[in-house]
Amino acid sequence: MDSSQTSLGEFESTLKKHAQELVESLERGRFGEAVQLIHELNQTRDRGLYQEVGKLTRELHSAIVSFQIDPTMPQAEEVSQITDATERLSYVVKLTEGAANRTMDLVEESTPVLNELANEAKALSTDWQRFMRREVAAPEFRDLVKRVDSFLTHSAEGNRKVSGHLNDILLAQDYQDLTGQVIKRVTTLVTEVESNLLKLVLMASQVDRFAGIKHDHDQLRAEKDREKHPTRGEGPQIHADKREDVVSGQDDVDDLLSSLGF
């Protein structure tokens, strides 16, 4: 049995114990005793509520304190200075954005190199096929040999450049280990906060039930709807001539102002 059930059980036990005593005190006219019994019931209810709020506060504080990063992770020293969950998520966005921009820059630098090599290879392939069909004269063949030699050199250089870019792209993804850990911790924290708030709501609803407190759910829903749409206009009135709460002319306006003392 958790503490909330214990607190509610204590309140229920006290309520059952004092209910009959309260009735007897009222019937016998001992109003002082009745007031004292009511006071004890209120104290029991408040004590249980305060205990639960304190417990939930301690659990929430413990969850926040334990919100740490593995010190062996890269860049852990920098992120360990960040204590707010929102700032941690912003830090994740910063790392992710930086890695994405770096990756796109490297891809943009590699694309022209690959396109140029592809075009050169296509042109050489066409001329090589002509050579294989013995359609190339000696001077043109010597030029073809020079082009092939240049292509091989250029191809090796382009390959080294693209290979380096691919390696840099791979290194740019190292942020995922750190950001994954940060997001996992934030998710755990949010889950714990949600769970604790749910416990508080459930406990408060039980206290309301024992205290006989009833809420106007229709009014609460209407207020929540107004909060969601604070700028929603009422718009033009439909069938205004059939409604008594709508002014339809200057005479009605004058009567309204007169009734308000203007």
From Swiss-Prot:
Residues 218-250 are annotated as: Disordered. GO terms for cellular component: bacterial-type flagellum; cytoplasm. The keyword Amino-acid biosynthesis does not apply. Its EC number is 3.1.3.-. Its main location: cytoplasm. The record marks Q181 as: Enhances dephosphorylation of CheY-P. Keywords: Chemotaxis, Cytoplasm, Flagellar rotation, Hydrolase, Protein phosphatase. This is Protein phosphatase CheZ. It comes from Pseudomonas putida (strain ATCC 47054 / DSM 6125 / CFBP 8728 / NCIMB 11950 / KT2440). The lineage of its organism: Bacteria, Pseudomonadati, Pseudomonadota, Gammaproteobacteria, Pseudomonadales.
